[in-house]
Amino acid sequence: MSKLVLILNCGSSSLKFAILDPATGEEKLSGLAEAFFLPEARIKWKLNGEKGNADLGAGAAHTEALNFIASNILNDELKNSIAAIGHRIVHGGEKYTQSVIVTDEVVKGIEDAAQFAPLHNPAHLIGIREAFKAFPHLKDKNVVVFDTAFHQTMPEEAFLYALPYSLYKEHGVRRYGAHGTSHYFVSREVAKYVGKPADQVNAIICHLGNGGSVSVVRNGQCIDTSMGLTPLEGLVMGTRCGDIDPAIVFYLYKTLGMSMDQIEETLVKKSGLLGLTEVTSDCRYAEDNYDDESKPETRRALNVYSYRLAKYIGAYMAVLGDDHLDAIAFTGGIGENSAHVRELALNHLKLFGIKIDNERNLATRFGKDGVITTDDSAFKAIVLPTNEELVIAQDTAKLCF
């Protein structure tokens, strides 16, 4: 068996894992351990096409999950084929512009960036430390891949806020973006699709899932993206508000008497599609009931969502200027599967000569890729499934094999 990479994506109460062959992209194992610290802590997986699940025990967390993977799921052949471990890291700050092997200095850098990703980075560090324990022979073969790295090519005019400059110089307050691993992968897929070298492609990439972001790529490099200091800025998302007037925070605090913790929970966990529908963060609910007059919240939510998305796409078309836009790409759970969202957003962009092909759009869902615009459309719109795990596996292999 060829050299394989174990990929870990640690959250505060869950752990996603996979084993990939970086040379072929073949997935040997995928799974999710969840409900950490609760009585119902559990794990489920798919190994060579066969599904399995198990209880981890009341209160189990990252340690128990990784030990279960190593001891109960992996057979000796697969375990011996794991040559390195790749970790997804949400925030690397300004320091990290590419993937690196884990060292004490790198761990310190992830800790320093945790102030901008307080829910994610501490959990990633737990994953790294537990991986050291579960796979001690691979301690010097752990690699971290940063979601912020691809966006580090943004120019100053794109990443700076119009705040006192000292906040940036002394405290790192600037725009960092997120979903960079996905944006990087899809930008390379766009290049293949249009027959151009990766370092010559110009694209607008819409990564739409429960979280969502748009990036604009010129000559293969990101020059702007919708998320900011944190993943709260930008698009309407499942539970996140995206762009708002910052003074709303003052109003909620001073006039409505909400605490800062309550405000944070409102903006991060109670807004977006959930806030607009007052029912659910699931985009499919709004889609399925869009024409139901008894549920006006669904039309309201989807219209706001797609309007905000169209504004970002249009703005980024302007940012490209004289550079020819090769394609607008849709990816992520919503981007790949919601023909309705794509249609609503692109219909706002008729001024640019974009023409959506309804038949192609409806046919391009559920893992299918393809062009969804007409042959005479001024610009192509393409649906391209993302593969962040493959990027992590390949980056890890480059550094370790």
Curated annotation (Swiss-Prot):
Residues where Mg(2+) binds: N9, E388
Cofactor(s) the protein requires to work: Mg(2+); Mn(2+)
EC class: transferase
Catalytic activity: acetate + ATP = acetyl phosphate + ADP
Residues at the active site: D147
GO BP of this protein: acetate metabolic process; acetyl-CoA biosynthetic process
Domain of life: Bacteria
Presence of keyword ATP-binding: yes
Cofactor mode of binding and number, as noted: Mg(2+). Can also accept Mn(2+).
Binding site for substrate: R88
Pathway: Metabolic intermediate biosynthesis; acetyl-CoA biosynthesis; acetyl-CoA from acetate: step 1/2
GO molecular function: acetate kinase activity; ATP binding; magnesium ion binding
Keywords: ATP-binding, Cytoplasm, Kinase, Magnesium, Metal-binding, Nucleotide-binding, Transferase
Binding-site list for ATP: K16, H207, L208, G209, N210, G211, D282, C283, R284, G333, I334, G335, E336, N337
Site (Transition state stabilizer): H179, R240
Chief location bin: cytoplasm
Enzyme Commission number: 2.7.2.1
Gene3D superfamilies hit by this protein: 3.30.420.40
Cellular-component GO terms for this entry: cytosol
Keyword Kinase: yes
Family listed: Belongs to the acetokinase family.
Subunit structure comment from the entry: Homodimer.
Function: Catalyzes the formation of acetyl phosphate from acetate and ATP. Can also catalyze the reverse reaction.
Protein name: Acetate kinase
Source organism phylogeny: Bacteria, Pseudomonadati, Pseudomonadota, Gammaproteobacteria, Pasteurellales
